[in-house]
Amino acid sequence: MSSSISPLLTTAISVAILLFSTISTAATIPNIHRPFNKIYAFGDSFTDTGNSRSGEGPAGFGHLSSPPYGMTFFRRPTNRYSDGRLTIDFVAESMNLPFLPPYLSLKTTNANGTATDTHGVNFAVSGSTVIKHAFFVKNNLSLDMTPQSIETELAWFEKYLETLGTNQKVSLFKDSLFWIGEIGVNDYAYTLGSTVSSDTIRELSISTFTRFLETLLNKGVKYMLVQGHPATGCLTLAMSLAAEDDRDSLGCVQSANNQSYTHNLALQSKLKQLRIKYPSATIVYADYWNAYRAVIKHPSKYGITEKFKACCGIGEPYNFQVFQTCGTDAATVCKDPNQYINWDGVHLTEAMYKVMADMFLDGTFTRPRFSDLLIKKLNYL
């Protein structure tokens, strides 16, 4: 499996080990010089490659096991909330690794009772939250929501670790990239219209998420990328539900974007503290908010012609209705998903996920640059 990676990414690898030459912008990392042998992913529906099925994901988006999901690349539904690949898929491809198997479909053990050799596992779950499910139950907010949280994903990871032999565990932390996809947007979404304030959600979410990251770091994780929240005010769902006078300079929902921006500031502050506390680890922040807005500002630069409408859905003005979402009988699909940012009202098209992957991998919207993480890793080889 091959895919293009950015010239900057290729250059970083070349400098680090002095074994690469720039062949073209479509270069791939040779198997013998993979910077990472494994990737472990966490997150929500923006990263989930199959831990959810139809009827199990976010309320109103329960048709991911049916066409037209998966139409662009896989030609069939693969339980990804998109027409094709996600950002994590492009990350795996860029490192010449297979797509990550979802944890719930993984055959974890062999005849000896130890874990089968894989190139990583995806623990992300669609609709998941950062805050424990019990919090939402206590506040009568658990109707039609996914019960899994980041702590569920951590528990799955720890259960997976139990199947590993000693050498496998050592190799896992030495040779693995931990990709923490966007998670926490659902915490805000599930409390909309309730008496629970966004400040409360932010404080609980950031503190819980920080504990999650520290648990991984205490286990020995050395290479970690953490995505911030995207510009949620630019999503079709937000555009269709918010008041028309609630708009920012880009035409997105200002209140929603401000909420994501404030959350990301708090997250970045915590990451700075973690870098000081764990100096031997490399923790990269992926600025999803600004990366997304960069595409909104200059869509034609990325081959995009439709910034706000959903490719798959029904109804004006955004081709989206909450009760007739993608996969229902009434929904239709646009002719070319590659020209759209949004796939089904909330989730993105393969084309947009690829743009995000490229921006993160080439370091345009990562701090420190993703290439710095690669150089540090390859200097240990």
UniProtKB/Swiss-Prot annotation:
Molecular function as annotated in GO: acetylesterase activity
Compartments, as annotated in UniProt: Secreted
Signal sequence, renumbered to the chain: 1-26
Active site per UniProt: 45, 344, 347
Protein family (similarity comment): Belongs to the 'GDSL' lipolytic enzyme family.
InterPro entries reported in the protein's UniProt record: GDSL, SGNH_hydro_sf, SGNH_plant_lipase-like
Record protein name field: GDSL esterase/lipase At3g48460
GO annotation terms (biological process): fatty acid metabolic process; lipid catabolic process
Pfam annotation, one family: Lipase_GDSL
Enzyme Commission numbers on file: 3.1.1.-
Keyword Lipid metabolism appears in the UniProt entry: yes
Biological source species: Arabidopsis thaliana
Domain of life assignment: Eukaryota
Top-tier EC class: hydrolase
Predominant location category: secreted
GO cellular component: extracellular region
Keywords noted in UniProt: Glycoprotein, Hydrolase, Lipid degradation, Lipid metabolism, Secreted, Signal
Glycosylation sites noted in the Swiss-Prot or TrEMBL record: 112, 140, 258
